């Protein structure tokens, strides 16, 4: 995941459906550039490009059916062995959704603007400054971890915040956040050195948690 996404204790872009989908596409393109066929690239999404390259070497074929039937790699288990077939099944169901599920009505996709922050900004301050609720901002930016929404960390500088077009005015909205609420540094982590006699409940009590 870290090849194409930011994953740390403040941001986890795997939780953002838009960013993670884009990253998945980038990974598939990378797998294809390494392995040369889409069946292998898709299987590598589960098993890794290196693992599939090893399977190709050991079976001396790029035919996914022959690899599935003959490759005996210890890590090549049920999920990897059936990943491509499952993809084909999902694709078939999606193409014939009406037959399988009836008349499904999808909600229209939201229209977002992405605003790249120019400083570290508290999430609640950012939301109130641009006129949206904190809950709405959180729902639209799931890549930010709970520490941001709980106020323990700020939205990082350079983070691309999604805001719904219909909820904010046109034009640059960053100036709506006053300079006094923009910081050059992230909120520092709290460190504590365990002392003799400490227990988890004692430490938690000292930090009111």
Predicted regions and their residues:
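Extracytoplasmic and endomembrane cell-envelope/extracellular-matrix remodeling and assembly machinery
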Residues: 2-3, 7-34, 39-209
């Amino acid at each position: 995941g870290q090849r194409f996404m930011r994953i740390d204790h403040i941001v986890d872009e795997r939780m953002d459906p838009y960013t993670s989908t884009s990253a998945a596409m980038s990974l598939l393109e990378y797998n294809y550039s390494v392995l040369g066929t889409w069946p292998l690239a898709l299987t590598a999404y589960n098993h890794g490009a290196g693992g599939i390259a090893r399977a190709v070497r050991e079976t001396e074929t790029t035919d996914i059916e022959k690899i599935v039937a003959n490759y005996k790699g210890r890590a090549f288990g049920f999920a990897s062995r059936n990943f491509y077939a499952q993809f084909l099944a999902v694709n078939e169901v999606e193409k014939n959704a009406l037959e399988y599920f009836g008349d499904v009505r999808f909600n229209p996709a939201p229209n977002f603007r992405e605003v790249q922050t120019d400083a570290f900004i508290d999430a609640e301050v950012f939301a109130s400054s641009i006129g949206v609720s904190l809950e709405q901002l959180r729902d639209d930016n799931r890549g930010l971890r709970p520490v941001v929404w709980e106020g323990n960390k700020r939205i990082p500088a350079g983070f691309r915040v999604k805001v719904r077009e219909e909820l904010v005015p046109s034009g640059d909205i960053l100036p709506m956040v006053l300079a006094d609420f923009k910081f050059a540094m992230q909120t520092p982590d709290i460190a504590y050195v365990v002392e003799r006699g400490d227990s988890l409940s004692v430490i938690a009590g000292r930090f009111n948690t």
